[in-house]
Amino acid sequence: MTITDLVLILFIAALLAYALYDQFIMPRRNGPTLLSIALLRRGRVDSVIFVGLVAILIYNNVTSHGAQMTTWLLSALALMGFYIFWIRTPRIIFKQRGFFFANVWIEYNRIKEMNLSEDGVLVMQLEQRRLLIRVRNINDLEKIYKLLIENQ
């Protein structure tokens, strides 16, 4: 096993740990989930570039008769990238004392101001940061509003 294979195993393990955390552990942290809303995906250009580069590496490894283990590891990396970028749905998860947005815990008392833009983006102003929450279904904004009013 080469150092390349070890690095690939490390990246695959990191992506797998992230996927498991995002899917199973994060919804169970900080109490029961009150509301979970699907968000719009960000630009997919980065993901196309990543999966494309891995596909080029697979092709290069196969045509140069590289190690079969490396080909399998690159394929697993491409599949993990495909899952994380295209199959997994980004979500905002509301709890009793705060919410998870982009895998970051934010307590409700950190929200200084909230606005709704004309194109349906909920803007939350924190102390030093602005969150742009783009929901997939525009009707979910009303659910978020009701939940925030109940918990304030």
Curated annotation (Swiss-Prot):
InterPro entries: DUF986 (IPR009328). Belongs to the UPF0266 family. The keyword Cell division does not apply. Keywords: Cell inner membrane, Cell membrane, Membrane, Transmembrane, Transmembrane helix. Disulfide bonds: none annotated. The chain crosses the membrane at residues 6-26, 45-65, 67-87. This is UPF0266 membrane protein YobD. GO terms for cellular component: plasma membrane. Signal peptide: none annotated. The gene is yobD. It is found in: Cell inner membrane. It is a multi-pass membrane protein.
